[in-house]
Amino acid sequence: MKFLSLAFVLGLLALANATPLNPGNVIINGDCRVCNVRA
């Protein structure tokens, strides 16, 4: 069950990184000019 939950969370993170149109994922996608999330 731990492996399934881990795969589920990784899947959600992959979906979040694949949708830059979502305003909540702007910092995750590295579109923010002030914060250096992705170098």
Curated annotation (Swiss-Prot):
Q: What is its main location?
A: secreted
| Leader peptide range in chain numbering | 1-18
One cellular component term from this protein's GO annotations in UniProt: extracellular region
Q: Which GO terms describe its biological process?
A: antibacterial humoral response; defense response to Gram-positive bacterium; innate immune response; response to bacterium; response to mycotoxin
UniProt KW keywords: Disulfide bond, Immunity, Innate immunity, Secreted, Signal
Where found in the cell?
Answer: Secreted
Q: Which domain of life is it from?
A: Eukaryota
Q: List the disulfide bonds.
A: 32-35
Q: What induces it?
A: By bacterial infection (at protein level). Detected within 24 hours of infection.
Tissue range of expression? Hemolymph (at protein level).
Instruction: Name the propeptide positions.
Output: 19-23
List the InterPro entries hit by this protein, alphabetically.
Bomanin
Query: What is the similarity comment for this entry?
Result: Belongs to the bomanin family.
Known function: Secreted immune-induced peptide induced by Toll signaling. Has a role in resistance bacterial and fungal infections. The strength of antimicrobial activity appears to correlate with the overall level of expression. Has no activity against the fungus C.glabrata in vitro.
Q: What else is known?
A: Not induced after bacterial challenge in strains carrying a loss-of-function mutation for Toll. Constitutively expressed in Toll gain-of-function mutants.
Mind telling me what this protein is named?
Bomanin Short 3
Q: Which species does this protein come from?
A: Drosophila melanogaster
Gene for this chain? BomS3
